[in-house]
Amino acid sequence: MSNDEFSDNERLKQQSQLLRGTIKEDLHNELTGGFLGDNFQLIRFHGMYQQDDRDIRQERAAQMLEPLHTVMLRVRLPGGIISPQQWLGIDEFASQHTLYGSIRITNRQALQLHGVLKRNIKPVHRLLHQLGLDSRATAGDVNRNVLCTSNPVESRLHHQAYEWAKKISEHLLPKTNAYAEVWLDGEKIAQPEEEPILGNNYLPRKFKTAVVIPPQNDVDLHANDLNFIAIGDNGQLTGFNVLVGGGLAMTHGDQSTYPRLATELGYIPLNATLAVATAVVATQRDLGNRANRRNAKTKYTIDRLGIEVFKAEVELRAGLAFQPLRPYAFSSRGDRIGWVEGIDGKHHLTLFIPSGRLIDKPGKPLKSGLAAIAAVHTGDFRLTPNQNIIIAGVSERNRAQIDALAQRYSLIDDTVSPQRKSAMACVSYPTCPLAMAEAERVLPDIVDRLDAILIRNGIADRDVIFRVTGCPNGCGRAMLAEIGLVGRAVGRYDIYLGGNREGTRIPRLYKENQPLEEIIRDLDALLSAWAQADNPDEAFGDFAIQTGIIRPVLNSSIDFYLQD
């Protein structure tokens, strides 16, 4: 492929001096609060997205002002583990140096700080460095934050799996010194640099990796390019089943784009893990589509080449043959809210955090509560892919103190319904530049109305995996929900039905471009019919398929867009 056929993102990566660009110079440009030219894209590789407050965009334009530019910074936390001391440092920065004063737990076990002004960007990177953290490769065409199942009960296996998640993350990080040079005033490297795994043009598109511990599929493995499913023997990790090619993003009106479940390749022993991770990434690096970013993800590479060709290429590069898959099964995706005791005798408290947003509100000082717990906790915090937080490793002696703090700050709330615990939304408005419709801000009201429907039908103890995403890029993972809403325009969504509770089936389009009030009426009728079927063991997504409300998606590359 000639350079003329590459997308412009390939040009800017090629000319970026291994992700340096002119970011340092842009930091000193006080005429704008944003980043210009290629730097707008390049800062993503450093873990940031340029945004503005869309609620006041028109008002500022009327005043002849540029948009209120800020960045959203994403902290890299492989497996979602963070110490109380690290948490307190981030908490203080969020309170004092961001416009919104909040911390957001992402569904990829990272932390996001929204509303960081240009003058505070370098200080936040220095703070992260002092805390032993960074934001490298949490955005851009690289391997993103590596997920790991949040399983505090099986502590030995979880710890082993987490260690591998951390190893994979470090192994696949960009090797350029650009991050240290730009943000930490590190010494400039004199000798030529190379990116031995990612390549000097990096990957064709973002790449997501997860380590999964059955029977929990909290990481939503089918949203990821590369998955390592932990296989254990008597609580000891022995190897991984490898799955590739998952992904949920699509583009409205472009049927060459679609969500896709990951495909099984086979089993590998532990000592082959990094070789296989490298081989999968390198195969996508060399064979992925660099001309059309809409079709640049690993899922499209696999469907274009065929899974057997892709598998053979990975085996060749890794120098091995995949063994037959080991048995595994998933039973759930949700978090066990409340206290559980691990096999090590330590106690773990999982706290429900609505949409992962930690902020102090009247009667709900959640952010202050987590800071109060962090000040006395001697274990660690674990962020879950359901955007909750686990106070992990609490001794019997300290349990009462932690529980009292959680109660005092309303972090424990027994009135939260099962349905609210099973709902998820992306950030969307006001900060996401891609948002087409509300998501996080409208979710509480939608769930209130769903709860009312369930209560009226006598099934308040049941719930549906329900997700709202403000655009079709998939951050809210609506394409793995039993009911998913995908934003079309302000106040309007596509309705998808028929995913399952385990997260192993893609839902199908039920109705397109519906106003929210119509959606609530439709869901009222659907949930009422589910209740009247009077089968407590049948999940809603299964009910929708069994009764013919929607046809199952069997092979999304072929039948995702087929309609009755």
Curated annotation (Swiss-Prot):
Pfam families: NIR_SIR (PF01077), NIR_SIR_ferr (PF03460). Its cofactor is siroheme; [4Fe-4S] cluster. Keywords: 4Fe-4S, Amino-acid biosynthesis, Cysteine biosynthesis, Heme, Iron, Iron-sulfur, Metal-binding, NADP, Oxidoreductase. Siroheme binds at residue 475. The keyword Iron-sulfur applies. Pathway: Sulfur metabolism; hydrogen sulfide biosynthesis; hydrogen sulfide from sulfite (NADPH route): step 1/1. GO terms for molecular function: 4 iron, 4 sulfur cluster binding; heme binding; metal ion binding; NADP binding; sulfite reductase (ferredoxin) activity; sulfite reductase (NADPH) activity. [4Fe-4S] cluster binds at residues 426, 432, 471, 475. It is an enzyme of class 1 (oxidoreductase). GO terms for biological process: cysteine biosynthetic process; hydrogen sulfide biosynthetic process; sulfate assimilation. One of its GO terms (cellular component) is sulfite reductase complex (NADPH). SUPFAM superfamilies: Nitrite and sulphite reductase 4Fe-4S domain-like, Nitrite/Sulfite reductase N-terminal domain-like. Its EC number is 1.8.1.2. Binds 1 siroheme per subunit. It catalyses: hydrogen sulfide + 3 NADP(+) + 3 H2O = sulfite + 3 NADPH + 4 H(+). Belongs to the nitrite and sulfite reductase 4Fe-4S domain family. Alpha(8)-beta(8). The alpha component is a flavoprotein, the beta component is a hemoprotein. Component of the sulfite reductase complex that catalyzes the 6-electron reduction of sulfite to sulfide. This is one of several activities required for the biosynthesis of L-cysteine from sulfate. HAMAP family: CysI. This is Sulfite reductase [NADPH] hemoprotein beta-component 2. It comes from Klebsiella pneumoniae (strain 342). The gene is cysI2.
